[in-house]
Amino acid sequence: MLKTIQDKARHRTRPLWAWLKLLWQRIDEDNMTTLAGNLAYVSLLSLVPLVAVVFALFAAFPMFSDVSIQLRHFIFANFLPATGDVIQRYIEQFVANSNKMTAVGACGLIVTALLLMYSIDSALNAIWRSKRARPKIYSFAVYWMILTLGPLLAGASLAISSYLLSLRWASDLNTVIDNVLRIFPLLLSWISFWLLYSIVPTIRVPNRDAIVGAFVAALLFEAGKKGFALYITMFPSYQLIYGVLAVIPILFVWVYWTWCIVLLGAEITVTLGEYRKLKQAAEQEEDDEP
């Protein structure tokens, strides 16, 4: 009886181990950690231009002025753990200085922000191993749509959350609304990763694979925020070594860790589809054997 149970358990866990082995093989072949380092470097160069472009778009729409402030606090509170206040002051100072630039300098900011989009596009298509290239005009349209519509959608989602928060004080659904607001960052991360894995690759991505990969990435991202904040709080070695400059390596490490999570979610999405194809091919070979 015990042997039968062990055989069944081994039979059920065998596909999981095979999939994990395939996932590890792809991570190694794609040099995921090196790719994450490249994206982190480009992200740090593009951070101020990207933020400047985003808040310039909000400034162009007066109805989003209040939402712009909420979005700013939401980003620094939920995407830059532990040191968000310090980084926020520096970035806002840099953005304020960038507003004094000429038209040529503003165009340079936009180009730098688009460079980040291009790097993300290239990295994800390298993971999907897609050799099909989009037309340049189409790629530019996609990048510009992300730059313009992305912040506006985020602002709209924050407006909805503010509306729910106002309902909290005027209804008997306090518990439900509290739970929705508590998981709101996770839902926003999940939707963002799902859109990233579905739209950016130049080949068709099965929707269920993108949903699973995005959910794992969102969970890791939320857990990573809490773990990273706990590490910075409990083991303040960076502050002891770097002093007032500690915010710089902390930002570097966090951006690198974030890109590792994003690329891992992409690898999971790809591996789900690849493993399914390999399994179907193996079953087909067994059926063809006499």
From Swiss-Prot:
UniProt topology in membrane: Multi-pass membrane protein
A single cellular component GO annotation: plasma membrane
Major localization class: membrane
Keyword Transmembrane set for record: yes
InterPro entries: UPF0761_bac, Virul_fac_BrkB
Keyword presence, NADP: no
Keywords: Cell inner membrane, Cell membrane, Membrane, Transmembrane, Transmembrane helix
Cell compartments where the protein resides: Cell inner membrane
A Pfam cross-reference name: Virul_fac_BrkB
Disulfide bonds: none
Transmembrane region(s): 44-64, 104-124, 140-160, 183-203, 210-230, 244-264
Segment forming the signal sequence: none
UniProt family annotation: Belongs to the UPF0761 family.
PANTHER family linked to this entry: INNER MEMBRANE PROTEIN YHJD, UPF0761 MEMBRANE PROTEIN YIHY
HAMAP family: UPF0761 (MF_00672)
Name of this protein: UPF0761 membrane protein YihY
Native organism: Escherichia coli O7:K1 (strain IAI39 / ExPEC)
Phylogenetic placement of the source organism: Bacteria, Pseudomonadati, Pseudomonadota, Gammaproteobacteria, Enterobacterales
Gene that encodes it: yihY
